[in-house]
């Protein structure tokens, strides 16, 4: 059954009549609606920076919430100081057997996941070998983002090459990546050509087990 609209219309008419009989409020009687307080802006959350260690041909860089700090391999003391600051420890140097043809000796500083090789007096450039996926709990990679545990397929996609032209990169035990000329040197594998420095990857099957930086093709060290 439909409801009649008459009662509602009647009420509406009465309301209009009452409104017409009521005088308009004076300005003093006008109701003031309080303005709402301005809302405080929502603070932007500070981005979280994941600590990481990156090893390049030139040296080591550490990034964390305080920023990025780096040290060049040409300054072994700076490299060791940076790693001590990052990991909270500086291992005792381990003497390396003197190599034939060299009139100076070498020492290794070995962390779990990394070792740094330099001469005893720290007068010559250092080099590093990545032996684990992290050092002191901090992930460590090359500047390409590769690390211990990376696959051969990832290296080949990045442009890695076999050290010997006679080897197949798909099966070679060692692969090189990158390459930058070292003026004043001569390549041992490419006589007559300027030597290069590069990143060396050592494989166990198809998985990287060690990364050496910087490697070169002009010395037998």
Where does each model-flagged region fall?
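Short helix/turn-capping signatures at newly exposed starts of structured segments
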Residues: 22-171, 195-221
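C-terminal motif of bacterial Sec signal peptides marking the signal peptidase cleavage site
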Residues: 17-20
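Surface-exposed intrinsically disordered loops and tails
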Residues: 175-191
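Bacterial N-terminal signal peptides that target proteins for export
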Residues: 1-11
């Amino acid at each position: 059954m439909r409801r009649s609209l008459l009662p509602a219309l009647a009420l509406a008419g009465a309301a209009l009549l009452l409104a017409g009989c009521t005088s308009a409020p004076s300005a003093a009687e006008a109701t003031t609606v309080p303005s709402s307080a301005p809302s405080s802006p929502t603070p932007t959350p500070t981005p979280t920076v994941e600590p990481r260690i990156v090893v390049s041909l030139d040296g080591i860089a550490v990034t964390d919430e305080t920023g990025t700090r780096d040290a060049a391999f040409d300054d072994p003391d700076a490299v060791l100081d940076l790693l001590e600051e990052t990991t909270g420890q500086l291992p005792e140097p381990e003497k390396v057997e003197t190599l034939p043809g060299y009139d100076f000796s070498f020492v290794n500083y070995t962390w779990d996941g990394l070792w740094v090789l330099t001469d005893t007096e720290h007068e010559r450039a250092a080099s590093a070998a990545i032996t684990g996926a992290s050092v002191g709990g901090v992930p460590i990679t090359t500047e390409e983002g590769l690390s211990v545990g990376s696959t051969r397929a990832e290296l080949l996609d990045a442009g890695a090459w076999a050290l010997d032209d006679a080897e197949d990169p798909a099966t070679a035990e060692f692969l090189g990546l990158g390459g930058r000329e070292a003026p004043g040197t001569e390549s041992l594998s490419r006589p007559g050509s300027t030597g290069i420095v590069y990143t060396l990857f050592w494989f166990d099957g198809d998985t990287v087990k060690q990364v050496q930086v910087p490697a070169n093709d002009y010395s037998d060290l």
